[in-house]
Every structure is written in C-alpha cells, then in structure tokens.
Amino acid sequence: MTDMNIENRKLNRPASENDKQHKKVFPIEAEAFHSPEETLARLNSHRQGLTIEEASERLKVYGRNEVAHEQVPPALIQLLQAFNNPFIYVLMALAGVSFITDYWLPLRRGEETDLTGVLIILTMVSLSGLLRFWQEFRTNRAAQALKKMVRTTATVLRRGPGNIGAVQEEIPIEELVPGDVVFLAAGDLVPADVRLLASRDLFISQSILSGESLPVEKYDVMADVAGKDSEQLPDKDKSLLDLGNICLMGTNVTSGRAQAVVVATGSRTWFGSLAKSIVGTRTQTAFDRGVNSVSWLLIRFMLIMVPVVLLINGFSKGDWVEASLFALAVAVGLTPEMLPMIVSSNLAKGAIAMSRRKVIVKRLNAIQNFGAMDVLCTDKTGTLTQDNIFLEHHLDVSGVKSSRVLMLAWLNSSSQSGARNVMDRAILRFGEGRIAPSTKARFIKRDELPFDFVRRRVSVLVEDAQHGDRCLICKGAVEEMMMVATHLREGDRVVALTETRRELLLAKTEDYNAQGFRVLLIATRKLDGSGNNPTLSVEDETELTIEGMLTFLDPPKESAGKAIAALRDNGVAVKVLTGDNPVVTARICLEVGIDTHDILTGTQVEAMSDAELASEVEKRAVFARLTPLQKTRILQALQKNGHTVGFLGDGINDAPALRDADVGISVDSAADIAKESSDIILLEKDLMVLEEGVIKGRETFGNIIKYLNMTASSNFGNVFSVLVASAFIPFLPMLAIHLLIQNLMYDISQLSLPWDKMDKEFLRKPRKWDAKNIGRFMLWIGPTSSIFDITTFALMWYVFAANNVEAQALFQSGWFIEGLLSQTLVVHMLRTQKIPFIQSRATLPVLLTTGLIMAIGIYIPFSPLGAMVGLEPLPLSYFPWLVATLLSYCLVAQGMKRFYIKRFGQWF
C-alpha cells in the first residue's frame, strides 16, 4: 500500500465513497483525457505490468473484480418467507386466542381442556405455508441449476523486480486489479474498465451497452494513417461510449488486438455501478399490488363481520364464552388461508408448463404478470432482430443489381489479413456459391490498407494473374468514399463524378438509409503493374472510380412479426424502446408490423415533464436513441397510466428496465446482468412462446381468481346464514369445531384448482387484479347460498323437529352436510360462466377431489369423529330433501350467474 500514490487512491476510491458525491464520476472517464504514460503514472503502474506482490496488495485494497448480483436466499429464509403472509398472521392470532379460551383458561379453572380447534388451525397454517415453500424452493433450485458456471480468465503481464522479466499469465478475471496490464484479442470480453496502451485494428462491440449493432473502432492514441497529432485528446463533450481510447467492462472484441491498463474493477466500473444500482429491493409488480389489495379487502371484511357475529350470539344466547368461540371459528372460515398456496401452486404449474417450451421462469409471480400484461416494451437489437448483419443488395450506381460489384466486394473482404468485421463476414457469407472458383484463383492479393476510424475505408491491392493488371479495391462509408472519388461507372462507361451525379448517388444512398439499411460504396483504381513488391499508401486512395453500393441489414427474427401480431390479437400492445438510431429502427418495426408514426427520441424524452411523457407514451409505439434511464422512465410512465408492462431485452443497457417492468423477459444469449434482472428467460429464439406465456399467465390468474371468488362469496354466504340463524335460533347453528372441520375440508377440495382449465372466452384479453370486482362478486353471489342454508334451517326445524337445545346436534349435523356440500358444489357452479358439467366440465383432478370431499362430508356425522365433535347420524329421509335442495341451488345459482354477467358484463 505504501507504494501507491495519493492520486491513485483518489482515482480508485471505493464505490461507497463515490456514491456519497452528488455526481457519479467513473475513474475510466478521467483517463480518456490523459496520455497513456500519465494514466500509468496515476495508477503507479508500468507498461510491463505489476509484480505479483503489487497485484496481491491491491487485491486486498480494492477487492475482487466482481459486480453485485442477486443471491437466492437459504432454504431456512425461504421457509420463513413462505409463512410471511397476512392471512397466516390472522390464523396464528386466532390459534393463540383459541389456545387461551380452549386450553389455558379451562386448565386454570380445573375444567376439561380441548386443543382440537388449535390443532385444526395450525394444520391449515402448516398446509398453506409448507406447500408454498416446497413449490418456490423447487423452482428456485431449478433456476439455479440452469445458470451456467463459466470461469473466465484474462491475460496479464507480470514483471519481476527492477522492471525486468515480464511474462504473460492467465488469471481469473476476478483477480484483476487497477494497474494490471491486460491483452485483448478477437473474441475476448473486456474484463474491466481499461485505458488502451497500444492497439491494432481494434473493434469493440458495444451493442450490449448501447443497442448499436455495429462495432466501433478503438485506438490507443489519435495518431494513425490520417496523420493526426498523437497528443490530440478526445472531445470532452463526448459520451462515455464514444470515447475512443477506453473500453468498458462487459463489451467484447470483434477484431484486432490491444494492450491496455486496468483503471477500474468491480463496482467502480460503469458496468459494476449499473449492476449495483439494480440489485436490491425490486419495485412492486402489478401482481404484488393486486394480491395485497385483495388480501386487505378480505381482512377488512372479516374484521367487520366477526364482531357482529359475536355481539348477536352473545346477546341472544347469553353465553359469551361460547359466542366468542363461535366468532373465532367464523373468523377462521372467513380467512382464505390457502390463498398463498393456491397462488404458488398455480404459478409453479405455469412455470413447469413453460419449461417444456424451453422457457425458464425465475420468479413465479411473473407468470400471472405475463397474463395481465397489456403493453410489451421490447428492445430491437438481438430481440426483434437476429443481431447479425446480412448483405441485402449489391448494386451499380444506377441501383441495378450487379455481379461485378459483388465480385469486387468479395475480393476486398476475402483479401484482408486481420480479423474481419461483421460487414466483411456478411459479404463472404453471401458470396459463398455465387463467386466462381475461377475468380478466386485468378486474383492475387499484393497489399492492403486496413480500416481505421478516421478514414472509414479499407483498401486491398489485387493482381490479375492472367493479365498482370493491378487494381486497388476500396470499400467504405459513403461520405469518406465520395471525398476520394473522381469518377463513377455507368454501365460500361466510366464518367466524371460531377456535382449532379454526386447528388443523385447521395440521394440513392440516403433512400436506402431511410429504409434502415447501412450503405457502403465500392470503388476501384488501376495502379502501375511494375515492381515485384508493390505497397499501398493512403495517397493511393485518390482518383477512385465508384463502382456501386452495398446495403446491409440486421433482419428481424422469423418469428418476430407473427409473435407481435399474436400479442396484438390477445390485447397486448407492443412498443419498441431502443438505443439504436430512428431510421434503422423504423425499418425493422415496419417489417414486423409495428406503427412507426412519429418516433420519439431520447433527446425529446429528456426534455419532457413526467405529465407530458405520460401522455406521449400512449400515442407512440417506437422510441429510439434511448439511454437505460430513459427506458426505465418510459416504463414507469406506462405503469402510472395503469398498464401492466412487460419488457423484452438482452443487453446491459436493458437491465434497469428489465428490473422495473412488471415482467422482465430476456434470452439465453443475453448479458449476464440482463438475465439476472429478468423474470423470464427464453432459451430459444422463437418469439411465439411469448403468446403462449400470455395465455398461460391468464390461465394461472383465472384459477387464482376462481379460488378467491369462490371462497369470498361462499364465506360471505355462510356468515349471512350464521347471522340469520343466530338471530332466530336459541342455540348455535353450528359449533366452532364444526366450522373448523368444514373449512379444513373445503380447503383440501381447493388444492386441485391449479390443475383446472379456463374457458377460451376468459383468455382473450389481459386480466388484472381488482379488489372491487371481488367485493362485488362476494356481495351479489354470496347470499345465493344463504337462501338454501335458510331452507335447510327450516327443514331441520319444522320437518325433523330439531327445534330445541336437546335436538341441536341433529340440527347442526343437517346444516354441516348441506353447508359443506353446497360450498364444495360451488366450485363447479362458479368456475365457469357457462353451464357446468354440460358446456364446461372441470378437469379430472377437480372432479375427483370435490367428489371425495363431498363423500367424506356425508360420512362424518355417521363416524366416530362425528360423535367426538357433537354430530349425530341423520335419518335417511333427510337425503332426498338434501338432493332437492342442492339441485335447486344449482338452478338458482345458474340463473344468478346469467343475471350477474348481463348486469356487469363479465363473470370474473
């Protein structure tokens, strides 16, 4: 540590110190404006690297070269989280009250104690929490197993004492420290934020950061073949990505090689800072907000109804202890304690179904958010497009397809000795099978001038083996090629490049640009054939004859257009949020069927207030030249407008948006930070799986909402029945233990709901949580069952003479069976808006589970358990009345269902 100067400490102060400052300054940014020697001095390093001792000491100071990432909590924490639910808290409180009233107080008075109620409530708690834990634990474990464990290394220089004996070593990138000198070559990931010391034909792909599909050239100094001053420094107004003498962590080398010094590692890099900012507490998704609102609606309802039941029974019966126990049982009955388990089971089932389509669901609630999603925002490069440049046209200056232009382009690309860029590779792929073998053998490469950032051209000198003619073939950007051209070829004639012809050619290239194509010009010049060792210089790139043009495109994925159309048919609007330029973006969007009217750019977004942006995001479908924060701002504007928003992206620059979306979707080839920030990962490029995810999400939501509507309406009906019975009957219509057993059995019957199916009509549009709808459903549908509960009361009171305290067991047994059977039958009545069993049948698991529970319910009064809890066998004459009551209930419920749909326009 003693050998590290003060400047170095300032440069690489821990990220926590930088965070305290108002403006985020990255160490690498400052080094772009210093010479290589100044940077080495500030880092107290050397062109031959660090010694082993120096590297070891700095590793202790700065820590490992790792960025923040999420960790799956230990199993114990997951177990505790499974019980972290308001309904569980309510049940635990009720279990505590039951323990005091049924066990502790009687024990103190020397009376008989009873823990049955406590055990039943704790069974419900355990069943709900443990099943939820098991489902989520299995899903987390599967997601972790699918993460690739790749150990990446970097090549560094390690010098001996006295700056001698430097050797190259391969070390894990986690062990890199500021001051290390690293080597970069084609195919390498840039392992840290680095300042270039030396480079040759170095091209870096920054698409993962910027969304721009074309690589950019990087260089150690501004001196190059164009003759720039080596001390000239970059423009300070440039963005971090535009600085040519630095490379950022997470980008990759597409061609060339370089030597660079590490300036920042870990969380002090640009990439690390972004990773740190997105790891932590996630914003609440639409799913979370919906579950919370529904949960508190039901809890508020319970808090209102339970005191009413207590007061009515207490005053009418005079036994406040018994009334308290009964009110306690009613509270348990009103608590949908299986909601967390039903939710988890439904989500896990959806995740398993999606995994068969090679889709990994990392966060279970993303399944439901998928179904609720009504806006999908997507990046362009690598998601809608193939992230692979293709040659589309090879044309002469008149815009006519030309085999000569293709041949010249192929000779230029195939004759380059360095690593070829994406456009050269596209030309070579296109030329396979189109360039005759005789052509390949006929021309011999003699020399080349590599591409560089200033000239923006690449030239090769080839010799015709048949005639000995030598020809310079130059390929490059339109403006730079126009600067060195004096002629162009029109058919078989070579004519002067007049101002008129120049304008016509520029108009053609601009027209292709407007269609989203990248355009290069190809030109030639005949050179003197004398000399055995011909060489090229920049001076030779003059008086060129333009032969034609090449157009390139990163085409959309085959499934993109179909997927977007399918999403639109299912009520999901698609918006494109990209860092790429508007022209290229518009072309791709048109091809896949997205409206490109009035594209909004990042500059325009930045100038808007939140209110203005909230209005504009509803009108526009395409947003270009966006920064990561601008993408997030657009997402948040859509969410504030009430939309459930998904985001599909694969780059580092997409990570914040992926994290803030209600459902973040990425692909397997995405950056690690993008995959970590996402909720769902597509393992294959077929985007049609998005439609399947939407349908599966709606099916999952439907089965969850079934449970809530059934439970809420059924419980409300029961409470209404209890209030009526309590007001007119001199004894409790059902004991607390009866209600607890009934509720437990009903809960068990609900366990099969995740395996039920939804009607096709339900799946046609996005579905969202709405506590008001559930409350309305409860108030309208719940009392329907009360009609037949009251009918049963009258039946037991008048027909079977269970109208006094001595006959209360018979009365309670009759309502126990009718209540359980009607509550279980309601599963089939309410699961569909159609006629149950005829137009829409439940799945086999639901039929078996509900049938079994109904059979057990009928048997209980005849069993030893029934005798233990105060029930008694019913006469056979009761059952024809029961069948008639249940059939009447089905008919009335179906009629009420039709009225409700006509009145409110929907069922769920």
Curated annotation (Swiss-Prot):
Single annotated GO MF: P-type magnesium transporter activity
EC number: 7.2.2.14
Keywords: ATP-binding, Cell inner membrane, Cell membrane, Magnesium, Membrane, Metal-binding, Nucleotide-binding, Phosphoprotein, Translocase, Transmembrane, Transmembrane helix, Transport
Presence of the UniProt keyword tRNA processing in the record: no
SMART domains linked to this entry: Cation_ATPase_N
Entry GO terms, CC: intracellular membrane-bounded organelle; plasma membrane
Membrane side Cytoplasmic: residue ranges: 1-80, 135-293, 342-704, 754-775, 828-840, 896-908
InterPro entries: ATPase_P-typ_cation-transptr_C, ATPase_P-typ_cation-transptr_N, ATPase_P-typ_cyto_dom_N, ATPase_P-typ_P_site, ATPase_P-typ_TM_dom_sf, ATPase_P-typ_transduc_dom_A_sf, HAD-like_sf, HAD_sf
Binding site for Mg(2+): 337, 650, 654, 718, 743, 747
Catalytic residues as annotated in Swiss-Prot or TrEMBL: 379 (4-aspartylphosphate intermediate)
Subcellular location: Cell inner membrane
Keyword Transmembrane helix: yes
Knockout mutant characteristics: Decreases Mg(2+) influx.
First-level EC class: translocase
Membrane topology listed for this record: Multi-pass membrane protein
Transmembrane segments: 81-101, 114-134, 294-314, 324-341, 705-724, 734-753, 776-799, 809-827, 841-860, 876-895
Alphabetized CDD domains for the sequence: P-type_ATPase_Mg
Catalytic reaction(s) noted: Mg(2+)(out) + ATP + H2O = Mg(2+)(in) + ADP + phosphate + H(+)
Taxonomy, superkingdom: Bacteria
Extracellular membrane side: 102-113, 315-323, 725-733, 800-808, 861-875
Protein purpose: Mediates magnesium influx to the cytosol.
Family indicated by similarity: Belongs to the cation transport ATPase (P-type) (TC 3.A.3) family. Type IIIB subfamily.
Entries under PANTHER family matching the protein: CALCIUM-TRANSPORTING ATPASE
Protein name: Magnesium-transporting ATPase, P-type 1
Protein's organism: Salmonella typhimurium (strain LT2 / SGSC1412 / ATCC 700720)
Encoding gene per record: mgtB
